[in-house]
A protein has these predicted regions:
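N-terminal secretory signal peptides
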Residues: 1-11
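Long, internal low-complexity/basic segments
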Residues: 20-23, 48-58, 65, 70, ...
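Active-site-proximal cap/lid insertion segments
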Residues: 54-58, 67-82, 256-261, 269-432, ...
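Active-site segment of extracytoplasmic enzymes that catalyze sulfate/phosphate-ester chemistry
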Residues: 62-65, 69-153, 157, 163, ...
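Substrate-binding rim/cap in mid-to-C-terminal beta-strand-loop elements of soluble/periplasmic
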Residues: 118, 214-232, 368-369, 402-486, ...
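Catalytic-site neighborhoods of secreted/periplasmic enzymes
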Residues: 119-241, 276-280, 288-291, 486
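C-terminal, low-complexity/hydrophilic appendages and adjacent surface loops
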Residues: 173, 407-408, 494-612
Length: 657
């Protein structure tokens, strides 16, 4: 039997799926049930109990951005006014929404953060700790993706509860691309002009690359790499993937107009991530008009983004002396031109970042409009707006993107819940929240019991653990004051090392070294009663360390060989090999000592003054050290421990390659 049937055009697999569902429905009917499908049997066991204005189990539309930070404190009044006038979709979501204004990510960069959001767990458990690009390709041995049989995703949780689940746009949690035979060249789903190729899109749809992760509807390739058409909007003439992702989102919403089951859809956009493409080399190619160049500066032609974007506090940060900060920060600044490209921290660079936000806001608006035009679905759907991480944009001594530090420019991102019925006007809270809270809160809003679903998911996943975040649904529904959660800390971790890998060669063909250790970071943010008359102040404590789990032999030793100079130049060169060990012997080195930062964010919101060695803050430091240890223990889970034959729980033994 062929994959396509002769008379219907349906794939054999989909016919089998339909037959399977029909069989389940028939069995359920024979048993006297309502005829629910296999995917919805859990939902039958968990009837929905209305809560205030939430009368029925909601649908969810997650709108995810890439690289959009929460507005920093040094924004000018002019920029604030511009955002209000030029980001209508974001402001529309706020008008009938609830915004958490102190929302923090769990990890960086794209892959670790996204895997964390959609599993509710940290990289220490799900294993997605590194980001492809720079020194690493998507197929390298030391770049691990999420295995579908380990930690369940949001799609798996909600499918177990009877939801239909869809993904449109950027994924970046597993290697979901289809490849052309004999190569690692991703199969495009568009023409050479950037137009949609529906036949190629259908191949992606039929392959169901995210089925094991609990989602359907993904169309690749992933939006990264050297092809300008794989950007958000920086292909020829301003074309890119975001426009297409919006179209796909609208098409899916139209199909869901009469959906029988509750549904969850992720509309995942690229921009303002295209800011990472800006630099001396890409701009030179852009302005020369060469074929295959990124369309960057040309997007600013006719742009109304102002030039006076920031107050003087930004310039103080951009000119900061990093010699008083952990050494990884200065090392990252020095290595950036080699790992990516030289970049001038100027006004046009800053304006481009906000122009990209305006561009993607338009595409998000297309999706939100499609939802709003369906009155019933709009009433029954909670829209969640968030970003995977922020962007430094040249602050703190000229740092770009999002690695090797834990400043608010990276950690704080937008987090908005929107629904025209649940939220009467704009509401906001400054309690500390985290990406770890997203999944538990959604389960809470859906009236789903985590323990019941977890028990079912253990049949298909090896690492079904308690979700480490909090259910904030009681705050959103007005049942509980946000102040109830005000003393809860948030935790952040990153082991991402973009300049360490097999492809550590600059655009000029020169080999470069990784960022100086210690460069792994873990942080805790909390409120403490250290202000006048015991008022609460927001504190942040960062630990920089050399995590031995990122070594070539995890927990034992790290062997690195560096051959300096141009990689394509013939002749002899001297290679230098270093061996770092937990217990070093002769000729080996020990890992460097940890380094720390302590900030009073209420007094010092731009994080310029490191109080770690300040004797007046020693009492606060001790408290923050305890909190970091507690948060690490509670949230930085490790792969477990499966029962052995005698019933005991033991760690899987590590076997070196």
């Amino acid at each position: 039997m062929s994959e396509k049937t002769e008379n219907s055009g349906l794939s054999r697999r989909r016919l089998l799926q339909a037959a399977g569902v029909a069989g389940v429905v028939g069995a359920a009917a024979a048993a006297g049930s309502s005829g629910a499908s296999a995917g919805s049997r859990s939902a039958v066991r968990q009837p929905f109990k209305p809560r205030g204005r939430l009368k029925r189990r909601p649908n969810f539309l997650i709108v995810m951005m890439d690289e959009q930070r929460h507005a920093p404190v040094y924004e000018s009044e002019v920029l604030k006014a511009w955002r209000l006038a030029n980001l209508p979709t974001q402001n529309r979501l706020r008008r009938n929404g609830f915004e958490f204004t102190n929302h923090h990510i769990m990890s960086v960069a794209c892959q670790p953060s996204r895997a964390s959001v959609y599993t509710g767990q940290y990289p220490s458990l799900h294993g997605v700790a590194q980001t492809s690009g720079a020194a690493k390709s998507a197929i390298e041995e030391d770049l691990l993706w999420l295995d579908p049989t380990t930690v369940p995703t949001m799609g798996s949780w909600f499918r177990a509860a009877g939801y239909d689940t869809y993904w449109k746009g950027k994924w970046h949690i597993s290697n979901a691309d289809l490849y052309q035979p004999g190569t690692y060249n991703p199969l495009p789903s568009y023409t050479d002009e950037g137009k949609r190729d529906y036949q190629l899109e259908n191949i992606y749809l039929e392959s169901e690359r995210l089925a094991q992760y609990g989602f359907e509807g993904f169309v690749g390739p992933e939006p990264h790499g050297s092809n300008p058409l794989n950007s958000g909007s920086s292909g020829p003439g301003g074309r890119g993937r975001d426009e297409v992702y919006a179209q796909m989102g609208v098409e899916q919403l139209q199909k869901l107009r009469n959906a029988k089951n509750p549904w969850l859809m992720v509309a995942s956009f690229v921009n303002p991530h295209d800011i990472t493409l800006w630099g001396d080399l890409t701009l030179a190619s852009d302005l020369s008009g060469s074929q295959g160049a990124f369309y960057l500066a040309q997007q600013l032609v006719g742009s109304n983004v102002p030039t006076d974007l920031f107050t003087s506090a930004y310039q103080q940060s951009a000119n900061e002396d990093l010699s008083l900060k952990p050494t990884a920060q200065g090392s990252f600044v020095n290595q950036y031109p080699q790992g990516f490209q030289p970049l001038r921290n100027g006004i046009e660079y800053h304006r481009f970042y906000y122009q990209l936000q305006k561009e993607v806001d338009k595409h998000i608006g297309t999706v939100v409009d499609a939802l709003a035009n369906d009155r019933n679905n709009y009433r029954d759907t909670i829209v969640i707006y968030l970003s995977d991480h922020g962007e430094m944009l040249g602050s703190h001594g000229g740092m770009f993107q999002k690695w090797h530090s834990a400043y608010d420019e990276i950690l704080k991102v937008p987090f908005i819940f929107h629904n025209p019925t649940l939220f009467n006007g704009a509401q906001a809270s400054d309690i500390l929240t985290s990406h770890a809270d997203v999944l538990p809160t959604m389960l809470g809003l859906a009236g789903l019991n985590e323990a019941v679903l977890a028990k079912e998911l253990t049949n298909t996943h090896t690492e079904v653990r308690r979700l480490v975040g909090r259910d904030l649904s009681s705050v959103l529904l007005g049942e509980e004051s946000a102040a109830t959660f005000n003393s809860d800390p948030v935790y952040f971790m990153t082991d991402d090392q973009p300049f360490k890998g097999a492809n550590a060669v600059s655009a000029l063909g020169i080999a470069y070294q990784p960022v100086e250790q210690p460069n792994c970071v873990e942080s805790v943010v909390t409120y403490l009663p250290t202000g006048p008359a015991g008022s609460k102040e927001r504190w942040k404590y960062n630990r920089y360390w050399d995590n031995s789990q990122t070594w070539t032999t995890p927990g034992v030793q790290d062997v690195q060989t560096f051959v300096p100079g141009p990689v394509n130049k013939p002749g002899n060169r001297v290679a230098v090999t270093t061996v770092k060990a937990v217990n070093p012997t002769t000729g080996q080195t020990a890992p460097p000592a940890d380094q720390f930062e302590l900030y009073n964010l209420t007094v010092d919101p731009t994080e310029m003054t490191n109080l770690y060695t300040n004797s007046a803050s020693s009492g606060t430091l001790k408290i923050m050290q305890v909190i970091l240890q507690e948060q690490r223990t509670a949230k930085r889970l490790s792969p477990v421990d499966q029962p052995w034959a005698d019933g005991s729980m033991r760690q899987f033994p590590f076997t070196p390659n």
